[in-house]
């Protein structure tokens, strides 16, 4: 519920690589419904788009203990905060009236978590579920492992907490089992996993059956991640999946049309939608230095070196290996869409398949179309690099070339600081470069 696995295998840097895989994340309540379709036990729940409906759902569910969960596509909800002042996107309450009150504070407000930017994401609906009293909680997930090129089970006897913290402080509590995709999870393997997770003897059979069904769900929905945190034994000896995080492979949209119809476009960043339409891998971040790079690994290294020199990247943007002039121009338009935020741009291209002269043409076209006033530092190496340098040199634009990445990062951070200082004091700054 609180901690989430970073794909793959607890590698926290993978959050910047998500667009390369292009996955679809479904809301928790959709995941819970899919669990039910596979005859997996979940707590009684309902979904509401307003406070009155939340009250009605609580009355329908019955009982005296409820959990109200904000439905936003971001991790860290439990420790998040709302623009309405409410602390926490997961609230435990005891009456339908309290359900109504908390839902009213969530719906329509923005939830800011460690996985959102400073604006957060708007909560359009809440999930109301019956609070079950558990005696033991476990962590279970199936994801894709690049090392074995197949599914892998990652599980733990410690659930309901941040699994990355468990991996760091008590790695022996983590169970990792690669799965042969040609065989899947057999009854015997499911039982072995349940035993290693530490289920009580009375619950081993139930847990084994759920693990088998979760693999069927993973495969049947073309998922890249099925995560249950926690999977729990209740006081009556029943095993439940208390929540569900489900990521689907966008390459399978053609055969998972019903699931992809569940996509919540309102939760997607408008710039990320534009980037995807242009076949660009883009994630908006909170910094001030725009980045345009080819290759996810080089893009992450570029962001690291910007931070090393005291700057903050405004985005992750991988133009890929076959970008056109039009794509490069669109990339600049996306980077500079928030004109009051981005104060400098670093272009870092290592031309292999990607030709540096194409990048240069795109930079020049974008700088002219957008009449860019902010400094642009360009580091180009590789295929057609001399042609690219010649294009930039004859463009009569104030683009700052730099062959050394470390020096380029230092330069863009200094220039960004100058622009930020000028903006803070309401002073216009113009950069001149001797030609």
Curated annotation (Swiss-Prot):
Residues 1-20 form a transit peptide. Binds 1 Mg(2+) ion per subunit. Mg(2+) binds at residues 229, 243. It catalyses: succinate + ATP + CoA = succinyl-CoA + ADP + phosphate. GO terms for biological process: succinyl-CoA metabolic process; tricarboxylic acid cycle. Its EC number is 6.2.1.5. The record marks 65, 133 as: Important for substrate specificity. Disulfide bonds: none annotated. Keywords: ATP-binding, Ligase, Magnesium, Metal-binding, Mitochondrion, Nucleotide-binding, Transit peptide, Tricarboxylic acid cycle. Pathway: Carbohydrate metabolism; tricarboxylic acid cycle; succinate from succinyl-CoA (ligase route): step 1/1. The keyword Lipid biosynthesis does not apply. One of its GO terms (molecular function) is magnesium ion binding. Residues 32-259 form the ATP-grasp domain. Pfam families: ATP-grasp_2 (PF08442), Ligase_CoA (PF00549). InterPro entries: ATP-grasp (IPR011761), ATP-grasp_succ-CoA_synth-type (IPR013650), ATP_grasp_subdomain_1 (IPR013815), Succ-CoA_synthase_bsu_CS (IPR017866), SUCC_ACL_C (IPR005811), Succ_CoA_betaA_euk (IPR034723), Succ_CoA_ligase-like_bsu (IPR005809), Succinyl-CoA_synth-like (IPR016102). Signal peptide: none annotated. SUPFAM superfamilies: Glutathione synthetase ATP-binding domain-like, Succinyl-CoA synthetase domains. The keyword Ligase applies. It is an enzyme of class 6 (ligase). It is found in: Mitochondrion. It comes from the Eukaryota. GO terms for cellular component: mitochondrion; succinate-CoA ligase complex. NCBIfam families: PRK00696.1, sucCoAbeta. ATP-specific succinyl-CoA synthetase functions in the citric acid cycle (TCA), coupling the hydrolysis of succinyl-CoA to the synthesis of ATP and thus represents the only step of substrate-level phosphorylation in the TCA. The beta subunit provides nucleotide specificity of the enzyme and binds the substrate succinate, while the binding sites for coenzyme A and phosphate are found in the alpha subunit. This is Succinate--CoA ligase [ADP-forming] subunit beta, mitochondrial. The gene is suca-1.
């Amino acid at each position: 519920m609180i901690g989430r696995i970073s794909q793959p295998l607890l590698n926290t840097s993978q959050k910047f690589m998500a667009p390369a895989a292009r996955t679809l994340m479904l809301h928790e309540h959709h995941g819970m419904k899919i669990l039910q379709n596979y005859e997996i036990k979940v707590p009684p729940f309902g979904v509401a788009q307003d406070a009155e409906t939340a009250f009605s759902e609580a009355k329908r569910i019955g009982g005296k203990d409820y959990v109200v969960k904000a439905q936003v596509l971001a991790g860290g909800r439990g420790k998040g905060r709302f623009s309405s002042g409410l602390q926490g996107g997961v609230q435990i309450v005891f009456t339908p009236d309290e359900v109504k009150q908390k839902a009213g504070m969530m719906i329509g407000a923005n939830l800011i978590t460690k996985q959102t930017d400073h604006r957060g994401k708007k909560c359009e609906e809440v999930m109301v579920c019956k609070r079950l009293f558990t005696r033991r909680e476990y962590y279970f997930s199936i994801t894709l492992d690049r090392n074995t090129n197949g599914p892998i089970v990652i599980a733990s006897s410690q659930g309901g907490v941040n699994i990355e913290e468990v991996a760091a402080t008590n790695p022996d509590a983590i169970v990792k089992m690669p799965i042969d995709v040609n065989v899947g999870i057999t009854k015997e393997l499911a039982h072995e996993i349940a035993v290693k997770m530490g289920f009580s003897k009375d619950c081993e059979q139930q847990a084994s059956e759920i693990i088998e069904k979760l693999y069927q769900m993973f495969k049947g929905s073309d998922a890249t991640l099925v995560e249950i945190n926690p999977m729990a034994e209740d006081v009556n000896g029943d095993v439940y999946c208390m929540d569900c995080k489900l990521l689907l492979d966008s390459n399978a949209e053609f055969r998972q049309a019903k699931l992809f119809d569940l996509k919540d476009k309102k939760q997607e960043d408008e710039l990320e939608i534009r980037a995807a339409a242009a076949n660009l891998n883009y994630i908006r971040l909170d910094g001030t230095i725009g980045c345009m790079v080819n290759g996810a690994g080089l893009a992450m290294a570029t962001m690291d070196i910007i931070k090393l020199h005291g700057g903050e990247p405004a985005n992750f943007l991988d133009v890929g290996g076959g970008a056109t002039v039009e794509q490069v121009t669109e990339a600049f338009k996306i980077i500079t869409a928030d004109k009051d935020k981005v104060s400098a741009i670093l272009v870092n291209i290592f031309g292999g398949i990607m030709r540096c002269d194409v990048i240069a043409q795109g930079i020049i076209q974008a700088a002219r179309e957008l009449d860019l006033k902010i400094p642009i530092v360009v580091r180009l190496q590789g295929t057609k690099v001399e042609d690219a340098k010649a294009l930039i040199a004859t463009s009569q634009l104030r683009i700052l070339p730099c062959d050394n990445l470390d020096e380029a990062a230092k330069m863009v951070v200094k220039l960004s600081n100058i622009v930020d200082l000028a903006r803070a004091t309401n002073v216009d700054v113009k950069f001149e470069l001797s030609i």
